[in-house]
Amino acid sequence: MNTWYREEGGIGYIEYDGKSKLGANAMLLRTLAASPHFEQFQSKASAAAEGILALQNADGSFRPWLKEPNYSFDAKYLLTFYSGEALVALLEYYIRTGLTRYFEEAARSAEFYLDEYVRNIADNYYPAYVPWHTIAYRHLYELTKADKFAEAVFTLNDKLLELQDRSYRIGRFFNPATPQYGLPHASSDGVYTEGLAYAFEMAQRTGDEVRAGRYLDAIMLSLKNIASLQYREKLDESSLPFYAYRGAIRTNAEKNRWARIDNAQHTIDAIQALGNFLGSKQASTFEPGL
């Protein structure tokens, strides 16, 4: 907070290298809303929520930058990540505070993206938006019980499963037939698995046992793949002490041996969510070591 948090005119945001993006500000609000010290940071959380709404258009869509970079960017691509993150942040802030304005604005944005990403999925599909919008629609279903949100979760995650590798590196989310969706990446595997955990819970909640089984199978395959990317033994060729990378998850099995925080954190979040939905007994059967 002392390094990157800024506040101007009642708007709170993260600024890094002269830029401030919707996705980072959404993560800021999520962190504050989840904090056990929320009361201490309540004014900053309120400012961060206003910062997200400052990037909301009249039709409910979002803009990706509060402070734009000095280089060209693809706003539509960035929003496949940031829009769902912003929705989740606003809803989690509402759940924490009960301030209905943020629920209403999140619902308004959700309606835009239901049309953009779900009803028109054939024209606009990109897998990066699936997990964040899944989590957002799961929250909205819990709050409203509107069937359209459950149906959206199923539409998105049924489509996502087309990306999962079932023949070569089983469990990863990469299909060579659709290279436009990106190269294999453990962070993607983790966040897709996290989204599928919420989709699994939605299927269970609505009594759709066929989908629940399909999603759980995909989750378990993904966790096995992620486990294969985890550093569990010391590397003879590395000069780093083992504790520096033990348990870390490398980015992919091919060339990228670097570990990233989000490779591990999305996986942790997926396992925690699934454990909450399944219960501790079944959760104990997850891939050991993760």
Name every feature range the model reports, one short phrase each:
Residues M1-L290:
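Glycan-recognition and catalytic cores of secretory/periplasmic carbohydrate-active enzymes
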